[in-house]
Amino acid sequence: MTELSKYRNIGIFAHVDAGKTTTTERILKLTGRIHKAGETHDGESTTDFMVQEAERGITIQSAAVSCFWKDHRFNVIDTPGHVDFTVEVYRSLKVLDGGIAVFCGSGGVEPQSETNWRYANESEVARIIFVNKLDRMGADFLRVVKQTKDVLAATPLVMVLPIGIEDEFKGVVDLLTRQAYVWDETGLPENYSIQEIPADMVDLVEEYREQLIETAVEQDDDLMEAYMEGEEPSIEDLKRCIRKGTRTMAFFPTFCGSAFKNKGMQLVLDAVVDYLPAPNEVDPQPLTDEEGNETGEYAIVSADESLKALAFKIMDDRFGALTFVRIYSGRLKKGDTILNSATGKTERIGRMCEMLANDRIEIESAEAGDIIAIVGMKNVQTGHTLCDVKYPCTLEAMVFPEPVISIAVAPKDKGGSEKMAIAIGKMIAEDPSFRVETDEDSGETILKGMGELHLDIKVDILKRTYGVELIVGEPQVAYRETITQMVEDQYTHKKQSGGSGQFGKIEYIIRPGEPNSGFVFKSSVVGGNVPKEYWPAVEKGFASMMNTGTIAGFPVLDVEFELTDGAYHAVDSSAIAFEIAAKAAFRQSIAKAKPQLLEPIMKVDVFSPDDNVGDVIGDLNRRRGMIKDQVAGVTGVRVKADVPLSEMFGYIGTLRTMTSGRGQFSMEFSHYSPCPNSVADKVVEQVKERKAAEAKK
């Protein structure tokens, strides 16, 4: 077993095409886990093992890989860069202790890089920066360093400088040791020599080395004082300070190279060992009660504690069902019986593996710090806590965003319904941001996801992985409804049909709630006019109707219901009577409260070459977008805007046409906003037409 201080659980984060999967491949090649590094553009990479990933050249799932470097165990997770799969990034951040942020040497800080960086900041994950693709035309290391300051508000700590650039890129100078690492043109990572610093770089190296030392010694008052008095710190002292500053995110050690050309990667691996934290050097995970409130207790990272582990990913592959688990505390052995605190059920551990992406190496035991896969677990979902039967506990839960787009699907042949249902069930277990429901009116199966590409991939998996041929409908926007006016009202439910009847009277106020408040229930009933035992029934009845609004049948958001008075009958009143009264009250009063249709607004971040900025902004304006910011860069302009989701279908094709394929964008849900009347009228009409068509079937 590797000692805990030598574990590094790291993720690799980047924008699409910045080279993070290739970076992972080179890590595996250098650490001896694979003999020939696959290329993403050839569809051969180790971590992009899904057919859809290999074909599209993007990472969709977070693939976990274990490897070793200088007696340290790396558990590496290669995460997606496309915005539709940021839930995978979030899920990975939950179980990581550190990360490598990969930026393109020519593209710089691109839209999705910023999103992933923000997620990592929120999760307090320490990172080093790797500026990749310095062999590319237009690459400029120091320009990207400046962008990380300007765009990400980060403090990069430059650790190396490139020798040459673009076609002339040969290697890097290590500022700490003042040594030049120069690779030959064979493309083999081990074919390098350590040389003197090139004469024309000496002054630049000394300038950046001085900046490095000045920043590092701020982590140690005694060292800083000695440095100010003219005493240069040792390399060991500097590394200790850099490690401390990296762990606290005071700065981010920044390296450069070319993963594709195998140049500069060894220094990045050394930096993972030297500067990123071990599992016992990060804040321990909090424990919560059943409602998700923190208890004040923590999962102490130690093999001597009772078992506390988090299932962070479920995957169905050619070997069967895999549950990926991060062990925070304790030990886990083959044959152990553990408790799933979310279900209250126990389960016996069968086979356990460490993963080389899509291949497995079976293991007998694992302990705190490990990321492993367990084969064949039942009734386990992403976010469930696995713990010692004698010491039940719950780790802080994962929260996933609500889907904003949906499509209707149906099997082409009648016999495919059961096959489709089984396949979708497995896919939901694997991806918590993918949802499914059945339309009550039409009986259609509705798939919901985070974006067009997300659902395209899911449909593709259903067809190719599970062999379900589908009829796929047009994408539908997840509209919502709300109210804009307060209404004071009352409703009496009375039913008499021999024997005991039903009676429940409620007086109430409904008013617009705070944004993102959902449904809020209050009671200001004085005395016993509506006994307290019936209040939950009133709340349940009204809340159950919030799923279907009165404008077009969309779910209702942000409504406050206050029960003010009412009446009951000693014999005829019951919880069910008051629940029915509340349901009828919803139908009666929501229409009086001036309901309004809401549409999802997306935060859109577009990169455009300078020549096309006017076209891009004009197009966003035509899509009812509101321009929030424009940031000029060296190679183009970043345009940030809020745009309705309904206007963004097919946008990538339009952007590529406008920019001759050079434009890029990312998009994530921002908020719900009132629909203009003209748009609302069209939506209502479309819903009516759809229902009429379904009624004829």
Curated annotation (Swiss-Prot):
Chief localisation class: cytoplasm
Domain tr-type G stretches: 5-280
Highest taxon listed in the record's lineage: Bacteria
Protein name, per record: Elongation factor G 2
Gene name per UniProt: fusA2
Family assignment from sequence similarity: Belongs to the TRAFAC class translation factor GTPase superfamily. Classic translation factor GTPase family. EF-G/EF-2 subfamily.
Annotated positions binding GTP: 14-21, 78-82, 132-135
Keywords for the protein's UniProt record, in alphabetical order: Cytoplasm, Elongation factor, GTP-binding, Nucleotide-binding, Protein biosynthesis
Function description: Catalyzes the GTP-dependent ribosomal translocation step during translation elongation. During this step, the ribosome changes from the pre-translocational (PRE) to the post-translocational (POST) state as the newly formed A-site-bound peptidyl-tRNA and P-site-bound deacylated tRNA move to the P and E sites, respectively. Catalyzes the coordinated movement of the two tRNA molecules, the mRNA and conformational changes in the ribosome.
Compartment(s) of residence: Cytoplasm
Biological process (GO), any one: ribosome disassembly
Organism: Shewanella sp. (strain MR-4)
Keyword Cell wall biogenesis/degradation part of the UniProt annotation: no
UniProt keyword Nucleotide-binding present: yes
